[in-house]
Amino acid sequence: MKRIVILGAGESGAGAAVLAKVKGFETFVSDMSAIKDKYKDLLDSHHIAWEEGHHTEELILNADEVIKSPGIPNDAPLILKLKAQGTPVISEIEFAGRYTDAKMICITGSNGKTTTTSLIYHIFKSADLNVGLAGNIGKSLALQVAEEHHDYYIIELSSFQLDNMYNFRANIAVLMNITPDHLDRYAHCMQNYIDAKFRITQNQTTDDAFIFWNDDPIIKQELAKHGLKAHLYPFAAVKEDGAIAYVEDHEVKITEPIAFNMEQEELALTGQHNLYNSLAAGISANLAGITKENIRKALSDFKGVEHRLEKVARVRGIDFINDSKATNVNSCWYALQSMTTKTVLILGGKDKGNDYTEIEDLVREKCSALVYLGLHNEKLHAFFDRFGLPVADVQTGMKDAVEAAYKLAKKGETVLLSPCCASFDLFKSYEDRGDQFKKYVREL
């Protein structure tokens, strides 16, 4: 019997373990951290052996194949040992893809992928299609393949997941944009990160579709290198060469495969970045044959994504917006661009090799004050202090950051949490960071 070892027992790993067990493999799960009770219960209910708090190498190095959590770097010592002895190391998505014939709509990009994924899922669900949501959001793809049957899966993919995918094929691949992110995981080499993102197109055939932002200079440059077989569906803000989806005369237009249009003001999501998300989602739904009426309705009644430009409250004339999901500089750029009032920006956290010059002009134009929130704020001081804005340095946590921002903000201004950084210095996750922000805003 083939032995499969799963490293990491979160949503992805626990789901992969269940699928491996259901398919008759000898299955073992190992996690360096504590495993959440709900995942222990899931593993126990399927009689899957597991360990937590350490990796027992002799129980791992004898695997025929290893499924790795996306959070474990490819250069982790244990992964290097496995690769050195020739043991295949794959992702949960790669493993799950072997056991389903469902259509795969896969979304990646440095920014916008969660909103776009959620919006595509909303359109498909609203059209009464049998659809699952998986990848970075929703339920583990492997668990759904093991326990449910869907005709379509809408899958958000990070570069870390794509790194360990080899034979998986996306029927529709969506690439929103490529800007510097996670460079700490890619030896601070931008090309390594770009190559990871473009893995979403590998194995695509002439029957498949590749949807991408036509104005992204990196994507345009890379297209020529990759010799893609898939049919190309570029989108842009305005009508231009090659774009099959754009806005013209305040109207959203998609010209292929079926002509579609709707008034831009009817879109539920506002702001330039959300226009791109809506265009990519509209093309995906159009390709799946969803009716124009269903696409229009779903694009106009979508409720948005938590922690992404989420309006929290207005306190004594000051608006508070939670954009905790902005874990890179480009995400913050989009958030600042959408601000219509003077803004107190809360930023900081675990820096991933950030270049803050991208937001320099917007910070100078839009911000009235800055709150640095993190254990190590030296880089923020070095870059932003010269702007001459009032600054608060907070190293203790979200409560103090919210109170500092509230004191700095004037009536009619906005406090924006858009950190540019990962959350792991002071918080468990970007969700934890956003939840704490909302909690302390509501306590003001």
What feature does the model see in each segment?
Residues M1-S91, F95:
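N-terminal leader/targeting and accessory segments in enzymes
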Residues R3, G15-K23, M262-C367:
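Nucleotide phosphate-binding/pyrophosphate-handling subdomain across enzymes
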Residues G10, S33-I35, I137, D215-D216, ...:
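Residues in the short beta-alpha loop(s) of Rossmann-like NAD(P)-binding domains
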Residues A20, V66, I107, N136, ...:
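Residue-level signal for inorganic ion chemistry
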Residues K21, E58-L61, P70-N214, I218-K229, ...:
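Phosphate-binding loop of NTP-binding sites
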Residues E26-M32, F210-N214, I346-L347, K366-L375:
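Short internal beta-strands
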Residues Y39-K40, T357-E413:
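C-terminal helical cap/extension that packs against the catalytic core
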Residues E51-H54, I90-E94, G227-V247, A298-S300, ...:
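Beta-strand->loop->alpha-helix junctions that form or flank phosphate-binding loops
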